[in-house]
């Protein structure tokens, strides 16, 4: 097992026309995330029981239909937010990939969480993303683009903070062959990294609240 999380940076309320937004980076990988809502939804898409989610990931270039990541973020938000509090409404979350030097999926998930925190959404639990790759039987956390390209397997964990404060798997997407022992090892590596990301959330939000109170 090798590596550690690259340096994280975040600027909240980055986009002035959004209800919540963030410019978030890990190393040289950077995204812009924004959210709008809860707001009105077209009658054909409205639910009597819960808020609907509109999730969109857009790469800086190439195909913008990043369906796997959209599904992971959608599944994660369904667990992290009590959607039943806002029936007949919708919330839109958009993530733009600005620069990709690896771990884009994890960075996109983290940026989406920051945008929702900036919006003041009531969470059941916060969430984050952690990417692990396998290179020559070695597991590497938060890989660069070069390390991803050399990998024989990738697993993206969407992690929620459990009621006991410990990380729990919320969603997962794996590429390549992974046996149970390898997945268990990857999850063991991801857990302390998820805790470090949650601590970073707390630091950033404390800074935001202290500024807002001035």
UniProtKB/Swiss-Prot annotation:
Taxonomy, superkingdom: Eukaryota
Keyword Thylakoid set for record: no
Gene null: resulting phenotype: RNAi-mediated knockdown results in retarded growth, accumulation of apoptotic DNA in 1.5-fold stage embryos and delayed appearance of embryonic cell corpses during development.
Listed GO MF terms: 3'-5' exonuclease activity; double-stranded DNA binding; enzyme binding; RNA binding
Family: Belongs to the RNase PH family.
Cited function: Non-catalytic component of the RNA exosome complex which has 3'->5' exoribonuclease activity and participates in a multitude of cellular RNA processing and degradation events. Involved in apoptotic DNA degradation. In vitro, does not bind or digest single-stranded RNA. In vitro, binds to double-stranded DNA without detectable DNase activity.
Protein name: Exosome complex component RRP46 homolog
Biological source species: Caenorhabditis elegans
